Amino acid sequence: EIMPSLVGSEMCIRDSDYVPESIKTKCFEKYGKTLEGAAAALFEFNKALIDALYDIVPAVKPQAAYYEMYGWQGVKALCDTIAYAKSKGMFVITDGKRNDIGTTMEAYATAHLGHTDVAGESIDAFGADALTVNGYLGTDGIKPLAKICDSDDKGIFVLVKTSNPSSGELQDMKLETNESVYEHMGKMCEGWGEDLMGKHGYSAVGAVVGATYPEQLGEMRAKLPHTFFLVPGYGAQGGGADDVKNAFDENGLGAIINSSRGIMCAWKKQGLTEDDFAVAARKEAERMRDEIVGCIGKIKLG
């Protein structure tokens, strides 16, 4: 049995609107109001958050788009963030929602999870531990990822039932089998993960299932016993501990709960200044952890 402090949230590191003015001023003075300056500010912000959270939060989920908008400089900040988080022992999930087939998907998998061959040298391009993906193209889009998950001990999270308000327009549609699209996608995740099982009964193929639909979350936990859940929607999107508790199995395993703005902008709720963002983030992460643990109890590894 281990202590439930390993239950934690992810922080989704986003764009420079969340970065305190003091950090932006420092970076803009050095690099100017340029893409390089913005990227430097992002990385400084990220480092401070990681330093404040790495011992209580198991994973970090940088959203690739908020780095790509700053060009190659932003992409470098993403690489640096991944490397720094991993140096602190954190599990890194790149939120890229990649979606393609064949050799193109293999290239995405190699870039984010695998090793790139450069004239016979094997080099990590991004080096994340897991990647969010869209499974709409079917098995052709998942096979290249599964291959690298197997060879390099990596993971993927397939979009199944997402937390956005319009997700039901497609995901809730009923098929001829009377199951919904999201239920069928979940079933496919179970199948894709059959040969990628870990020692605690979960596969390398996970599912994104939103906290904003708690009833479906509980149903999917029962139907997908070997699929690890990434659960967005906690905090700023309205989800709470009661909404996410059904994502976990009877041993308190099987899910990681995502909080982004709720952690990054916690200083606003706590009546602090933006320069206290790291202290506030830690306090909020501890509160969130304790709230979730209060619902699910201690984690048990049998």
Label for each model-derived stretch:
Residues 207, 211-258, 262-266:
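A C-terminal functional module that forms or caps the active site or interfaces directly
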Residues 56-58, 62-119, 124, 213-216:
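N-terminal active-site wall of soluble small-molecule enzyme domains
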Residues 50-57, 82-87, 146-152, 221-224, ...:
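Acidic (Asp/Glu)-rich catalytic clusters
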Residues 244-250, 265-301:
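C-terminal helical cap(s) of enzyme catalytic domains, especially alpha/beta-barrels
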Residues 22-47, 99, 172-179:
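Active-site mouth loops of central-metabolism enzymes
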Residues 100-205:
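Conserved anion-binding
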Residues 10, 60, 95, 131, ...:
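Conserved, mostly hydrophobic/aromatic
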Residues 1-8, 13:
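Single conserved hydrophobic/aromatic residue that forms the stacking wall/gate
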